[in-house]
Amino acid sequence: MLLLKKIIRLIFLICTLQLKKNIGKLGVLLSLETPKNNSEVLNFGKQLAMQIAASSPLSIDKDTLDKNILKKEMEIIEEEVKNSGKNKEISQRITESKLNKFINENTLLNQEWIMEPKKKVKDIIKNVAGKDKIKIKKIVRYKVGEAI
């Protein structure tokens, strides 16, 4: 007998609320897919939304990162390294290192968890999920006045 787990889709919306004039200028939409619907997952979703608001990831992971963004960043890095006067082998290692740093800083799963910087977001997700799986389906971060 095949037992299908009910997949619960949780969507979090968090707006930064500050007193005075900055009320609601930043928002995050986060869609999670998980078989759990408990307070731990709900609290984690809120924390993850705050992570997104604070760190402005460009995508969830490397696979979903826009190839044009990667290409432009690679061109910038190559030009920078070329001007440094290093030999080809060292230049290649520097380029790879800088590109990996860019990817880690701009993809949500590879970012350092703001509340525990020694861990990455993907490690925190594994800890919260336990045996079950939490999947990030979609993230949207918006700021008043920015194009979406």
Outline where the language-model segments fall.
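N-terminal assembly/interaction segments in proteins that build large macromolecular machines
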Residues: M1-I148
